[in-house]
Each structure stands twice: as structure tokens, then as C-alpha cells.
Amino acid sequence: MASSVRLVKKPVLVAPVDPTPSTVLSLSSLDSQLFLRFPIEYLLVYASPHGVDRAVTAARVKAALARSLVPYYPLAGRVKTRPDSTGLDVVCQAQGAGLLEAVSDYTASDFQRAPRSVTEWRKLLLVEVFKVVPPLVVQLTWLSDGCVALGVGFSHCVIDGIGSSEFLNLFAELATGRARLSEFQPKPVWDRHLLNSAGRTNLGTHPEFGRVPDLSGFVTRFTQERLSPTSITFDKTWLKELKNIAMSTSQPGEFPYTSFEVLSGHIWRSWARSLNLPAKQVLKLLFSINIRNRVKPSLPAGYYGNAFVLGCAQTSVKDLTEKGLGYCADLVRGAKERVGDEYAREVVESVSWPRRASPDSVGVLIISQWSRLGLDRVDFGLGRPVQVGPICCDRYCLFLPVRESTESVKVMVAVPTSAVDRYEYFIRSPYS
């Protein structure tokens, strides 16, 4: 039986504590792309110190939120479509970010496992209580064992993963009083014009936007069959073993693989094998690549808009499942190496109006690497989080940090229920 969550205070909108500009800000072409019209939703679980005063903690969080919204005032605005439908804007009138407080009979240990269903933890961020959902919603939930869950939702079109982590660390520092607003670095930078269309017409080939035939009823299966969340932790020893396997099955002369390359390849290969797809079905692995320092000139420090493009590894089911891990890791490496300034600028043009290219869903697995964002360092005075994860575990595959083990990675993804046992078998049997 799912645990209950109950609001204990009326939801409020928290405005910036100081006056902020009343203006309309344009989001970039990358921000406005159709692919990003969804929220980033984090779940941070804290082992609250004994005797913590709930009222004092909640008040401190609320005050820190109001202060952090001064430099990040667009998060207190509202997103709207431009009149000509060419993109999105943020109307900034200090409307406020959402703040909720709740209690639950969950305990911190409940979050050590995968959720029982994709939406089991949905009530830990009750965004639907707001008639118009703000770009930022925060929910503080007191657990039955005295621990605390912090749900945070960001409008992805306003901010990306790196930007959201920078905001959360500022928010937390202000809550503890460890830093003053004037001292915090990097200062948030808007400058969304830096990733706008320049009207280029000569664009290269971008497989992430290409369509492939659905030979297996892939879309139907992922939309109609129940998805079951999974959670598996890879420690340093396991990752080293994957690197050795990859090197033993790669072309002579390859440089050692990174943990991301081998883990992504292993997850992708295990996922594909578990689904029993036709040999000729084309599969794609998509993953975000930070372009802050890949574009020329580099984006300014503190740029918190969407500054990533999708790397795309593509192959057939036959090659992915029959060739070794080294082959998979090579595909991931090649996808990373293709991304430079020219590639990124072409993506900006591709997703801009009127082209509005968007990734296909046929044969696609998407990986998002939260393990390197610094979410495990977000301390509101309750210590560092004991668990970092998503509000909802769906078909997006997430790489998550592991407490007190910087070289370990927790992998969460939901797969069709009929494939769960096979997926977990192949994950744990890299030599098979």
C-alpha cells in the first residue's frame, strides 16, 4: 500500500524579498524547443538531526527561497508562448514561486529502493494545487521517522540541470546562513540571446532528429504496457570491471573508456536485450552534452538556461546485442566527440521556429546524468541528502549520486514489466 502525504499548510506563492525588474524576458531557441516542455523534478531526502524544530526549519526555508529569488527572479515569473508562436517568454512581475509543506508516513529508508510504481512518489511534489504552475515549486515533507523530503520542480524551458543545481546550492547556503547573497558565485546570467537562431540554412546530419521505422510496436509497448521502476547501484569495483570488459572487446589502440561511456553502453545493451526486439530495429541512445565550453566563445559563468544538446549513438538491435561492450562504449564516445561549436549551432537552428525538430521516440533510450550536478552537496542545515532521485521514475534513465561514495552511480529507469527480470539479469551479467 502506498504511503499517504497530507498538506499541513495552505500552499503559498513566495515572491522575491527585494524589488526585481518588471519585464518580459525571451527564452532562447534551445529553451523554447518542444522537447523541453516538461519539468525537472528532484527528490532530496535528509536524515534530520534529532530535535529539529519544524516551524523554525520551514520558516528558514521560506525566507531563503525569497532571498534566492532576487537574483533568480525569472523563476518567480510565468512562462507564456509568444503571440507569433515562435518561442517562449517569461513574464516577470514577481508573481512568486510555489511553496508547500506536508507530512507523510514514509520513512527515509523507503527511498533506498525503487518506487513500486512510476508515480508512487508523485505526492511529494503536489504542483497541481496551483492553478498556474510556477517555474519553481518547492515542497517540504516531514517523514514519520523525523527525516525530511524536499521535492523541487523546475520548468525545464527556463533552467537546465547545471543551472538548477547552482540555484539549489545558493538556496541552501542562504537557508543555513553560511553565505551572503552578495558573496555567492557564480552570479546568475540570463543572456539567452547567445543560443538563438542565426538563420543558418546549411545544416549537417543530426541522427537524434531522424525518424526510424517502428518494426516492433515499440511506441505501443512503452505507452500501453505498465512500466516498472528499477534501481541498481554500480560501485567503483563494478565500474572498473565494465571498463576491463569494454577494453577486451574493443578495437586495438583504443584509449581507456570513461565510467560514463561503459556504464551507458552496458545499460543500453542490457535494456535492448531485455526487450526482445527484432534484429533490424534501429535503436538510439540519447544523452545530454553540456555545451557551455564547447561553443565559441564559451558561455559566461552563471548561465543557467538550457546549454546542452543531445548526443546520439545509433545502431541496430543485432549489432548492439551481439557485439561486445567495447562496441557500445565506442558508439557513446563517438557521439560525444561529434559535438563542437558547429554541431551545437546546427542543433540551435534545427530546433528553432519554423523547423522545430524534435527527437523521435521509436527505439530511443534517454540517459540524464544527475550524478555530476552537485545535488548531493545541497545542505539546508540538515546535513547532505542521504538520497537523491526523481519524483517520478519513468522511461528516462537517470544516473544518480550515491551518498559518501563519489565514484559510485545509482541507475534508475522504468522498463516494461514483461522485461524487468531479463533487464536485471543482463545488468548483473555483463559477461553473458
UniProtKB/Swiss-Prot annotation:
Gene3D superfamilies per record: Chloramphenicol acetyltransferase-like domain (3.30.559.10)
E.C. code: 2.3.1.268
Regulation: induction: Induced by ethylene in ripe fruits.
Catalysed reactions, semicolon-separated: 2-(methylsulfanyl)acetyl-CoA + butan-1-ol = butyl 2-(methylsulfanyl)acetate + CoA; ethanol + acetyl-CoA = ethyl acetate + CoA; butan-1-ol + acetyl-CoA = butyl acetate + CoA; butan-1-ol + propanoyl-CoA = butyl propanoate + CoA
A single MF term (Gene Ontology): acyltransferase activity
Tissue spec. comment: Expressed in fruit.
The protein's enzyme class: transferase
Transferase keyword on record: yes
Keyword tags: Acyltransferase, Transferase
InterPro entries hit by this protein: CAT-like_dom_sf, Plant_acyltransferase
Pfam family, one: Transferase
Domain of life: Eukaryota
Cystines in this chain: none
GO BP annotation list: alcohol metabolic process; fruit ripening, climacteric; response to ethylene
Keyword Ubl conjugation: no
Active site: H156 (proton acceptor), D379 (proton acceptor)
Task of the protein: Involved in the biosynthesis of volatile esters which confer kiwifruit flavor. Alcohol acyl transferase that can use a wide range of alcohols as substrate to produce esters. Exhibits acetyl-CoA:alcohol O-acyltransferase activity.
PANTHER family: ACYL TRANSFERASE 4
Family of the protein in this entry: Belongs to the plant acyltransferase family.
Protein name, as recorded: Alcohol acyltransferase 9
Organism expressing this protein natively: Actinidia eriantha (Velvet vine)
